[in-house]
């Protein structure tokens, strides 16, 4: 058991390596911030966004408006009757199960 894994680098060495890796990005970022100081991120977002949010909610269409209006009223929508026990799809119909077609009152032009 003399083959041990190499000892991890100390915290100072790791920090120094990270600084070497990140320093080009940080240097570029510092240059851009010095060149364009007015483009810094504002905590609340852009002025345009803040103004739009102050105006109130806008709706995409009348459906969105009506849904929001219904939520405000907490109006219960009518539900289907619970006594309905009809099951659909319980069997596959065959030609014998189907009712006879009624003859049409209007003669078809194709029948000739």
From Swiss-Prot:
The species this protein belongs to is: Taeniopygia guttata
Instruction: Provide the family line.
Output: Belongs to the endosulfine family.
Q: Provide the function of this protein.
A: Protein phosphatase inhibitor that specifically inhibits protein phosphatase 2A (PP2A) during mitosis. Inhibition of PP2A is enhanced when ARPP19 is phosphorylated. When phosphorylated at Ser-62 during mitosis, specifically interacts with PPP2R2D (PR55-delta) and inhibits its activity, leading to inactivation of PP2A, an essential condition to keep cyclin-B1-CDK1 activity high during M phase.
Post-translational modification, as annotated: Phosphorylation at Ser-62 by MASTL/GWL during mitosis is essential for interaction with PPP2R2D (PR55-delta) and subsequent inactivation of PP2A.
Q: Which spans does this entry mark as compositional bias, Low complexity? A: 1-11
Q: Which GO terms describe its cellular component?
A: cytoplasm
- Fetch the InterPro entries from UniProt: Endosulphine
Q: Which GO terms describe its biological process?
A: cell division; G2/M transition of mitotic cell cycle; mitotic cell cycle
* Protein's name in the database: cAMP-regulated phosphoprotein 19
Q: Subunit structure, per the record?
A: Interacts (when phosphorylated at Ser-62) with PPP2R2D.
Matching Pfam families: Endosulfine
Keyword NAD appears in the UniProt entry: no
Phylogenetic placement of the source organism: Eukaryota, Metazoa, Chordata, Craniata, Vertebrata
Protein's cellular compartments = Cytoplasm
Keywords recorded for this protein, A-Z: Cell cycle, Cell division, Cytoplasm, Mitosis, Phosphoprotein, Protein phosphatase inhibitor
Q: Does the keyword Nucleus apply?
A: no
Where along the chain is composition biased (Basic and acidic residues)? 12-32
